[in-house]
Amino acid sequence: MFEEANDTLGFDLATLCFEGSHLELMQTMNTQPAILAVSVIAFEMGRQELGWEPCLMAGHSLGEYSALVCSGVFSFRDGLRIVRKRGMLMQDAVSAGLGAMAAVTHVPRDQLEQWCRLSATETAQVVIACYNSLNQHVIAGHQEAVGVVAELIQRKIPQAGVKYLNVSAPFHSPLMQAAADKLAADLGEHEIREGHCLVISNVTARPYGLQELASLLYRQMTHPVRWLDTMEFLFRQGVSRTVEVGPRQVLTQLMNDTYSSIQTYHFDNPQELEHLHSIFASGHYSRETIAVSIHEALMAAAIARNRNEDMTEYNNGVILPIQQIRELIEQIRQDRNLDMTSTLYRIRDLLQIVLTAKQLSSDEQMKIVRKLPTSKNVVTLIKG
């Protein structure tokens, strides 16, 4: 896949990742495609090795784009092009040294929000850019204003932690507005497809439909990453396991600290990979169990309220896909040589078409899609 990335970007991304200088890698126009490529490659390797398909995906910041590529919404090539452009726009939006980001620990959310409001001026802004957990946030904005908040924290709460991040721009802050406006135009040039599974938006902390994709990615540039709310959503949905893809284990640690009942795994840990492999290997459902689970999801989709009054769209987007799913259910029961993985992919895609055509909300879609047989209710997390 690195060859495809090199061809897409017009430079040797593999060499940049493994041999590039620290200065080159820290430029966000290089960092973003590098992280996306490594994350997608790791996901594909894990999928082939473990034979698992996630029921849902969530990515933190840039990781949301990696999740969209892994879920099939964007092609690998388009994903690389988008984040390369995104990185350039972010880098150009703020002059070097003007912006800053800092990770803050052990400061209550309300207190930090208040200090950001009090420290901001017409010419120097500072906001919370990431709500990572109850005890961890990231602030971003003009360097002067970020510095004022940092001094307040150190003076008022000595036991709190403040660590400046080595980034080239203040992401997820109002300073990215000009970059967001330009990115919006670029997003319209790329094909958006039905994904294999739902992806959670950083802006809403809920799965979104294709019609919301461009607007939410636009807003993600200037709005905070609601990761704490994302973890709460996963917990309330009954998620039992998460697998983190990509460099480091930041999201795994955040999940362990916040919802310890959810089992967490990371691709970098060989022992955890072996454990996952044994789980998935022993978790094969009987064909009849698979067929029954799909039928239950299909019935839920069939009786769900329809909000689409266009009969042509209803026929093409609801009636025909439901017929196709019924035919596939019979194939599952009868054809012992059937490729189960690709068949389940196809059924998930068809069910998503039905739910979208009926104009169901993201939450309604999520409840029905989760009825499909999955790899032990596993969610993939990808750090940006």
Regions of interest found by a model, annotated:
Residues 1-36, 329-335, 345-375, 379:
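Active-site catalytic motif of lipid deacylating hydrolases and related acyltransferases
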Residues 1-114, 242-270, 310:
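FabD-like malonyl-/acyl-CoA
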Residues 159-253, 282-332, 351-383:
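Acyltransferase
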